[in-house]
Design a protein with these regions (language model features):
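ATP-dependent carboxylate-amine ligase catalytic core
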Residues: 2-151, 159-189, 201-205
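Intrinsically disordered, low-complexity terminal tails and inter-domain linkers enriched
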Residues: 77-123, 180-186, 277-328, 461-477, ...
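Structural motif
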Residues: 12, 124-128, 156, 194, ...
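A short helix->loop->beta-strand "cap" motif at the edges of active sites that frequently abuts
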Residues: 153, 220, 407-409
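Amide-donor transfer/coupling interface in amidating biosynthetic enzymes
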Residues: 2, 232-279, 285-288, 293, ...
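Cysteine-nucleophile active-site neighborhood
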Residues: 384-465
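Phosphate-binding active sites in nucleotide-utilizing proteins
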Residues: 332-386, 390
Length: 555
């Protein structure tokens, strides 16, 4: 796949480690760019939903997750090498291409594909890294540095200067000159450096003096010294404590903007990144007319609506004339989306749309039933444990789901969605009824039950024959890649006909972990979060089951 078009500047925010201040700096930069009238598309490296949700909330644009390991649909292997610089996997290239589009965040149907209207292209593609710059999976796969190298983007290095003086130079020099094996001897390209957790003006002077020889010898400038005192506070983003849609009103955009403008040389940073002076006005709509503050806030609120086809709009011709193979039996996927279910990768609607599906949303918390036009239901991850009483109280939804399951409607749940498909969840010793579609109970624990990259091989008869022209036993293995992160222990409820697993689960180095998931009839659930571009064959097969259900149940 060719490299991304260089006409849109891009920048990767990489840090010396976790808690270096990458997220506060990234969100501050997004606010400052908006205040300057610049349109940014943001993304997060790795599988983390939380920070990506904050990016989307502040920009009004869907925020992608970019990952160099999860984007490949293949069996894992200890001998698997990270791809060399410049070789972009097809899946990763598709995600990056979508970032080159400015989507309408205002709930209308408009949206311009990148290249058709320069004013509708983002001014900057901003990617926030995870952990330390070179931290990743096996042999560095999935690291922020590896991603930056593949995409050809420069890195702005965030240095945690807390409790550090002259040693900051040694830390910075190590990061600037490190040569990972996958880089083929080529260094990561650095745009500049920013120091965070600066204690005082005297501390700032010491850091500046210590880094001066390095900036002179490398040509990598020091672009900011961000003080610890007075830094804007962000709501906790730990799993299970807060959602972006709940925390957004508490985010002081003006404070974030002022903090980064006062302590960073943004003009130089943007010039080095190749960002042009914006032609659109701040707080303006597409016609250039000023937008009243109340209307602007309403539009930002609409940006929290569920991810649907409008997030990745097609051209008018594509929308009105889908491929001939999709016209007769275009499946309609009901996406569970409310406070309890919000962990959906931003690219999943695009992948489902490209595979021929249409998406509608519903709320297991509030609705009496899924939309009547649905031919399949998907329950993403989220926080069902925080909304267990409300989910348990909605008996109408539970009854409707049991009726649809009896008719054979395909249903699939991931992590939090899997919990909802079970009989019950126990929280702090108290049980709460869930939908009761799968013979499983679970209990929320205080420590992580599972964490890490995962590759999974689908059972031969699930979700559907992957190659209808072949015998089922001769079909090629269906592999997906994704991530697992949960605090929950599950318990099987014995049945005369036991549940069957969905996946054979492996870690990133190809070590077998366990048979994973539970399926009973047309209902299936698993702890695995499938990465959309690492599971296209799976979703294509699952959509076939939805189309078959539609054909069997509709005249």
């Amino acid at each position: 796949m060719p490299k991304p078009q260089p006409s849109i500047p891009g920048l990767v925010i990489g840090g010396t480690g976790s808690n270096a201040g990458k997220t506060t700096f990234t969100l501050s930069l997004l606010c400052a760019l908006h205040a300057r009238g610049l349109m940014a598309r943001a993304a997060k490296t790795g599988p983390d939903y939380i920070d990506a949700a904050f990016h989307a909330a502040l920009t009004g644009q869907p925020a992608a997750n970019l990952d160099t390991w999860m984007c490949r649909e293949a069996a894992p292997s200890p001998a698997e090498h990270p791809l060399p610089a410049g070789r972009i996997p097809k899946g990763l290239g598709r995600v990056f291409e979508r970032m080159s589009t400015v989507c309408s965040p205002y709930g209308d149907a408009e949206g311009v594909k990148a290249g058709t209207n320069p004013s509708a292209r983002p001014d900057l593609l901003l990617v926030e890294g995870a952990m330390g710059l070179y931290d990743g999976g096996h042999r560095g796969a999935g690291s922020t540095a590896h991603l930056a190298s593949l995409l050809g983007l420069p890195v702005l290095l965030v240095l945690n200067a807390g409790g550090m003086g002259q040693s900051i130079a040694a830390l910075a020099e190590g990061f600037l000159h490190h040569r990972p094996a996958w880089a083929g001897g080529l260094p990561v390209r650095f745009l500049g450096m920013v120091c965070t957790h600066v204690g005082s003006a005297r501390h700032a002077d010491l850091l500046r003096q210590s880094l001066a020889p390095l900036t002179k010898s490398t040509g990598v400038p020091l672009l900011g010294l961000l003080p610890r005192q007075g830094a804007p506070e962000l709501p906790s983003r730990h799993l299970g404590l807060v959602e972006a849609r709940e925390a957004l009103p508490a985010v002081d955009r003006q404070a974030l903007t002022q903090w980064v403008e006062q302590h960073c040389d943004l003009n130089r940073m943007l010039k080095l990144a190749g960002v042009r002076t914006p032609q659109r006005a701040v707080n303006a709509d597409t016609s250039g007319a000023p937008v009243p503050e109340a209307a602007r806030q309403a539009r930002l609120s609409e940006a929290h609506e569920p991810p649907s086809d409008r997030f990745f709009p097609l051209s008018d011709a594509q929308a009105q004339h889908p491929p001939r193979s999709q016209r007769r039996r275009r499946p309609v996927v009901g996406l569970a989306w409310d406070e309890a279910f919000s962990f959906c990768y931003a690219d999943l609607p695009a992948v489902l749309h490209e595979l021929g599906a249409r998406i509608v949303t519903f709320s297991p918390l509030r609705d009496a039933a899924p939309p009547i036009e649905c031919s399949g239901l998907y329950f993403p991850g989220g926080y069902p444990e925080l909304h267990a009483p409300g989910l348990a109280a909605n008996t109408g939804m539970r009854d409707a789901l049991h009726g649809l399951a009896a008719q054979g409607m395909p249903m699939y749940g991931e992590c939090g969605g899997y919990i909802y498909l079970m009989q019950s969840v126990q929280i702090a010793g108290q049980g709460h009824a869930m939908s009761g579609l799968l013979p499983r109970n679970c209990a929320l624990g205080a420590s992580k039950a599972a964490l890490g990259y995962r590759a999974a091989q689908a059972a031969p008869d699930w979700p559907a024959p992957t190659c209808p022209t072949l015998k089922r036993s001769a079909a090629p293995p269906l592999w997906v890649r994704g991530h697992e992160f949960h605090y929950t222990q599950e318990e099987e409820i014995p049945l005369p006909t036991p549940c069957r697993p969905l996946w054979r689960l492996y870690d990133s180095q190809g070590r077998f972990l366990r048979d994973e998931g539970c399926r009973l009839g047309s209902v299936a659930g698993s702890w695995l979060h499938c990465y959309p571009e690492g599971s296209r064959r799976f979703w294509r097969a699952w959509l076939r089951t939805c189309a078959a259900y539609f054909s069997d149940t509709r005249p």
